[in-house]
């Protein structure tokens, strides 16, 4: 490799210019490198979601989940399939092997699902999407107003705030949640309908095509052809009242009055109302909207945060008087603090390295020449990060910090050898060439050996590879850059800046004096003494080394282990789950009690609560219904997140009748231990779940143990009597349609009225039932006349599971435990020991998953990478 120095010395100015250009280019591109806490994680997961309002979990599983699972079974690369069936919704998650082309996988899944669409219930349209951590909001805002209603506020947010936020570099999408839309509700009068000879079905048929534009041919002449279309949007909701729902009867009526068309206003009332609430959002106790920003490819959480905070005053002004715009959660500050903290530590490491160089080289010129390799090598590594689209995060910055102490080694070796030959009286050019030639092989082999330690990590697959490949790449590039710098830039700088021997000096005298000075140096004298003693007691030294190695290996087992530690942050989360089947009002009342606790804590700067699912990434898989409330808690700048979490947990534990409360951090998913229980017998699975929860509940290593075993919720079942229902022309499908219309009405159209879109809802025309007895008493209109529901069907109130979960087609329950501390490895060991002595019902098996499975797989792969690194070093 000494040929590099020969070329550099022959073209010194060109070499210096090239590396100055490298520094300038680095200064231009490094600020654009995105900043994150952790690297982007491209999870190999394709999700399928489907909605079928009103269907029970059992029906969803049978009619939607099972056909979808069968349809995608032939897609290549699927490792595991999980599905959850809930009231009116199905979710299927397909886990592929890491390295799978998700674009191709998604296309295959879409094709498979489209083929199965014909077997699904009418109106069910599955949606396929690729899961990604970039779809998680990087920043969330809350918007409230004391002067505007929700619709007006939402309109201003969508027209004035969202477009401005979408212009921020790195923002992928801005979503607004919490808005209750408006519906046009048509409520028929049964008596007037009967007098006009109409039915609800006839009314529905008249409303269904309303507002559509239809082609009516063309008008042409010799010069042009003009198309004709009929229909268009309504100007106002009241225009509906003039809709003709039945033409005039020919010849007039029996009373001699002139016949006239039947207008909608003659048989029904038309009102504009808010859509039924399926979720509520409040910020600091006030009704609000949520605005979530997701980060696109190449985006930076820190940059997005800075830009949003800069725009907040203008955005508040754009919303108008009385509007409040608040940042609820923001990953930017924690990312910025993590990055800046590592930058400071890296800078301190660089300073310490320079001081050590001064101590040993005892020359300011030599120190400056050697120290040049540090920023130059790191800049080259950062340029590669930028070129690869990687980010500055705790792992890549940690890699740069590690590299600081190593990148200068090659330069010191080369520089010290050049300086030694200059001390021998050798001419400057010859001293540089000889000094580099003597150590080039050693420096190259040493650096390549060190790089070889990190290369196997780049071959690791899975989540570990996603996390540590940027780390190993950064270290490897920095060290290779240091090798190139030591063999090119350092010789040139040494030629220019190191003091040459005096002209006419006696080389032999200089060599003798230099060698004598080396022998009498304090470091060499002490080292030679230690070396002699070690060689005189070779066996003792070897035994000491072996004992030290074995002791180190033994002590490693005493270390705490965790997968991805908690980065802290300035946000907490609170999840509140009430009994299944709890209504929105019950959950709202319980959430208000939690809000009272939050508002009384000085450590809490702001909070937002969402009851039900407000949409966004993960909503499909969260299972959040109106019996669940989720809180985002922004802490005050001087608050201690860990202490505040403990205090909040203590305060909430004192509440009664508010459901199950869980306090967590606002960072990525917590380190939870999960136990998967699998079995075909629901009763055995339920019994096994109780046994496992009881076995783990008392373990000191665990803080909280829960399960996703679906609790029972009230459900009304209607079972048709084939004989009696058949006399009235009622099949199961017809009965479901008639009962559904009587219970909740139906959306028959979506209209554009003015600039807004409204769902057109046809009410049943009677009071909506609120109890099982009222459902039994429903009067159904059939072709054979009116009949009570309980005369043609059996109506029962039963308890039914609120959800059904399957893994690879088998019913599964997951027991989740939160470690009491940071040692997730110890928590997993305690769980294994506890469950090894538990007898589960026949047919039920358990397996450890969650963070422990991830951690074990990570340690296994990194262990193999370490073994491969040792093998490469020994080659």
Positions of PLM-derived features:
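Juxtamembrane segments of multi-pass membrane proteins
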Residues: 525-528, 536-654, 659-660, 671-674
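Hydrophobic transmembrane alpha-helices and their membrane-interface caps
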Residues: 29, 323-324, 352-359, 364-419, ...
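Hydrophobic, glycine/alanine-rich multi-pass transmembrane helices and their short helix-loop junctions
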Residues: 27, 355-360, 380-392, 444-490, ...
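Helix-loop junctions and hydrophobic alpha-helical segments within the transmembrane domains
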Residues: 328, 335, 339, 415, ...
